[in-house]
Amino acid sequence: MKIISLFLIHSLLFLSLPSFAIENEEDIKVTKLTETDSSWEKTKIIYPNGDSKITALLVEMQPKAKMKMHHHEVPSFGYILEGTIRVQSESGDIKNFSKGDVVIEMINIKHSGINPGDTITKFVVFYMGTKNLKNTIIEE
């Protein structure tokens, strides 16, 4: 009987957790930043096969700093924390991203980025890769 009572008490506590977790939901605000199946220049996102590897980077670009031409083998996206970055693809497409913007990166398309402003640009990049693929390949 004691075992059954303990089981019931633990079960009730466990079942009450979800309601407790959202009891004060007015204190929590959720904002969808983006939802898409393609990158900013409309290339379809396809996840690679293999053992998963997630990488997150904080990138800080000084004013007027320019990235070398590069491409990504894996899907990635970024969130601009401060400043602006101007991205240009090898075909000449250009897009500016500023504080609060989500950047869905191009996959296997050469591109570069520049901080066109007079302040530091900071952004976080998340790569959804695999152990056998490089996140970024710098063009020589």
Regions found by a protein language model. Give the residues of each.
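Positively charged n-region of N-terminal signal peptides that target proteins for export
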Residues: 1-5
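A short, N-terminal "cap"/entry segment at the start of jelly-roll beta-barrel domains
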Residues: 8, 17-53, 96, 104, ...
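Conserved short histidine dyad/triad with adjacent acidic residue
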Residues: 55-72, 107-110
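Short acidic-glycine-tyrosine-enriched beta hairpin
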Residues: 61, 91-108
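Short beta-strand segments in beta-sandwich/barrel cores
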Residues: 66-67, 84-88, 102
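Extracellular/periplasmic catalytic domains that process cell-envelope and extracellular macromolecules
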Residues: 71, 79, 116-120
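Glycine- and acidic-residue-biased ligand/ion/polar-headgroup-sensing regions
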Residues: 74-91
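Ligand-binding loop in jelly-roll beta-barrel domains
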Residues: 108-133
